[in-house]
UniProtKB/Swiss-Prot annotation:
Protein name (database record): Large ribosomal subunit protein eL21A
GO cellular component: cytosol; cytosolic large ribosomal subunit
Gene3D superfamilies: 6.10.250.3260, Ribosomal protein L21
GO biological process, one term: cytoplasmic translation
Note: There are 2 genes for eL21 in yeast.
Family that this chain belongs to: Belongs to the eukaryotic ribosomal protein eL21 family.
Compartment(s) of residence: Cytoplasm
Quaternary structure and partners: Component of the large ribosomal subunit (LSU). Mature yeast ribosomes consist of a small (40S) and a large (60S) subunit. The 40S small subunit contains 1 molecule of ribosomal RNA (18S rRNA) and 33 different proteins (encoded by 57 genes). The large 60S subunit contains 3 rRNA molecules (25S, 5.8S and 5S rRNA) and 46 different proteins (encoded by 81 genes).
GO terms for MF: structural constituent of ribosome
Keywords, in A-Z order: Cytoplasm, Isopeptide bond, Ribonucleoprotein, Ribosomal protein, Ubl conjugation
Keyword field contains Ribosomal protein: yes
Signal peptide: none
């Protein structure tokens, strides 16, 4: 017997709700504001079938290009063969959430602006580039009252 290749085939676990997260959708989902240019993550909500994306787009990140009263238009770059195609999806707000991929960058921009303003007030140059973790500083261990000890492994014995 042939295998079925329906629109939602092989999504038994992909679209199921999380453990103890069943039931009605929280109102905060509908109160989030999406603007054109926002970066969003696609995560389908299995309890809302309307405006649900195809299984391929689960977990993908895209950019909002259109906003209507109940749905959001998202642009996704899909790899087809050896090229990327721009796909435009119209999804309901239950199936998307704001991406945290730029969160660290935006926090760093604010921190750098504060550092720059403080340095300008003091009239000093400031280093804003991130530095990799440096080696630890050297240490000196005193042997005064702390005689080095030689350690040796204890021989393994079996008692039967």
């Amino acid at each position: 017997m042939g295998k079925s290749h329906g629109y939602r085939s092989r999504t038994r676990y992909m679209f199921q709700r999380d453990f103890r997260k069943h039931g009605a959708v929280h109102l905060s989902t509908y109160l989030k504001v999406y603007k054109v240019g926002d970066i969003v993550d696609i995560k389908a909500n299995g309890s809302i079938q309307k405006g649900m994306p195809h299984k391929f787009y689960q977990g993908k990140t895209g950019v909002v290009y259109n906003v209507t009263k109940s749905s959001v238009g998202v642009i996704i770059n899909k790899m087809v063969g050896n090229r990327y195609l721009e796909k435009r999806l119209n999804l309901r707000v239950e199936h998307i959430k704001h991406s945290k991929c730029r969160q660290e960058f935006l926090e760093r921009v604010k921190a750098n602006a504060a550092k720059r303003a403080e340095a300008k007030a003091q009239g000093v140059a400031v280093q804003l580039k991130r530095q990799p973790a440096q080696p630890r500083e050297s240490r000196i261990v005193s042997t005064e009252g702390n005689v080095p000890q030689t350690l040796a492994p204890v021989p393994y014995e079996t008692f039967i």
